[in-house]
Each structure stands twice: as structure tokens, then as C-alpha cells.
């Protein structure tokens, strides 16, 4: 589900930031965005929206960034693009990861680019009331291979055999020579695996 995608994204971020930190999120969003931050033991920092695209008030957002800010979790509400050149510059200049919630905005664009292909990671929902449905379903997209590998494993109980990066998988095997390589778990995780039947419905 989109909720599972949110939770998995935040769980994977805990492997990048084991010390924790803050996630900036808008108050106008779905509850699973906020819950996913809390479940991962990050601290949500709420920044109010503007009235034009229901995204962050960027002046308030800049004033809310601290040295503990790990990501900006933006929600594209009701098909509206929440991005701007200024927001992307803030993320780039401060080296803060941008997470996109695209659950309500499949197909929307920013500067001729599809939403969900711009941030560090993006979450989609295939709930029956959304643009594309698998009845229930979700997806994470990212261009970062390490983050992708984390998501692959953490969506399947944390099993390192799910890793397609051979070097990353071998590292776990080398660290645990006394364990069966097919049953090494990287830590607490979930079973968020989808199935082919749902995928067919989406097609």
C-alpha cells in the first residue's frame, strides 16, 4: 500500500541515519506520512502550507531546518505539484533528502518531469480510489542503489538474500559466517511484498 511505502521509506532511512533526526512534513497530508515518521523514531517537524499549491510555505520551511534535519517529506496533494525550483535548491544546498508522497498525484508534472522521479525517493499508492489501482498496493521509486537494496530487504523481513547487490550481500555473509547465508536478517523489518495478481489488476 501507499502506507507501506511510506513506512518502508522511513525504515530504510533509519539505516542511513541510525542516530535519528528530524523529518520536515506538512500538516496537510495523509496520516500515514506522519505515522511513518513516528514509527521510525524520527521527529516530525510540521511546516505550514501556502495557499497556491498547498505545499510548504518556503520561508517557514527554511527557518525550520536544523542540523538534525534528515529529509523533507513533501506531499503532492490532490494532483497538485508541490515542488518548486526554490525547494529543490534548498534540498541541494543543505544536502537534505527530498522524499515525495505522490499517492494522490500520479502523472502530475514539474518542469516537464513526472512527479515521483525527482526526489531521493518517492512513494506511490495503488488504492482503489487513486489514479491507478491494484485494489491495494504501493511502490517506492529511487535512483539510489544502496537505498533500493535496503528497501528490497526490509520489505521482506529484512532478509539479506533479497539483496541483488552481490557485494552488499557478501558483506553480511562475511560478518556472520556462523549463519546460513539464506537466513541472515539485517534487523527489524516487515512483510510488505506485493503479488502478481495485484500487478495484473494494475495493468
Regions found by a protein language model. Give the residues of each.
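Structured binding elements
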Residues: 41
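Hydrophobic alpha-helical segments that mediate membrane insertion or helix-helix packing
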Residues: 5, 23-25, 126, 138
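Active-site region of PLP-dependent enzymes
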Residues: 105-111, 118-203
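Conserved coil-to-alpha-helix start sites within the AMP-binding
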Residues: 3, 28-34
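Hydrophobic/aromatic ligand-binding patch that stacks against planar heteroaromatic rings
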Residues: 35-37, 90
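Active-site phosphate-binding strand-loop segment of PLP-dependent enzymes
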Residues: 52-149
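Phosphate-binding glycine-rich loop
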Residues: 1-22, 38, 46-48
Amino acid at each position: 500500500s501507499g502506507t507501506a511505502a511510506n513506512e518502508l521509506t522511513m525504515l530504510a532511512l533509519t539505516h542511513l541515519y541510525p542516530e535519528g533526526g528530524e523529518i520536515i512534513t506538512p500538516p496537510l497530508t495523509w496520516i500515514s506520512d506522519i505515522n511513518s515518521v513516528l514509527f521510525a523514531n524520527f521527529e516530525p517537524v510540521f511546516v505550514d502550507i501556502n495557499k497556491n499549491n498547498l505545499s510548504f510555505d518556503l520561508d517557514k520551511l527554511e527557518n525550520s531546518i536544523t542540523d538534525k534535519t534528515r529529509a523533507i517529506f513533501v506531499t503532492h496533494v490532490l494532483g497538485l505539484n508541490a515542488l518548486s525550483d526554490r525547494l529543490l535548491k534548498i534540498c541541494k544546498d543543505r544536502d537534505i533528502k527530498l522524499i515525495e508522497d505522490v499517492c494522490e498525484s500520479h502523472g502530475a508534472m514539474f518542469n516537464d518531469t513526472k512527479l515521483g522521479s525527482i526526489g531521493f525517493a518517492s512513494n506511490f499508492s495503488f488504492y482503489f480510489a487513486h489514479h491507478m489501482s491494484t485494489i491495494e498496493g504501493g511502490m517506492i521509486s529511487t535512483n539510489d542503489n544502496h537505498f533500493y537494496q535496503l528497501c528490497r530487504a526490509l520489505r521482506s523481513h529484512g532478509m539479506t538474500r533479497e539483496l541483488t547487490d552481490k557485494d552488499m550481500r557478501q558483506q553480511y555473509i562475511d560478518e556472520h559466517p556462523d549463519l546460513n547465508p539464506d537466513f541472515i536478517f539485517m534487523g527489524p523489518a516487515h512483510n510488505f511484498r506485493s503479488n502478481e495478481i495485484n500487478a495484473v489488476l494494475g495493468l
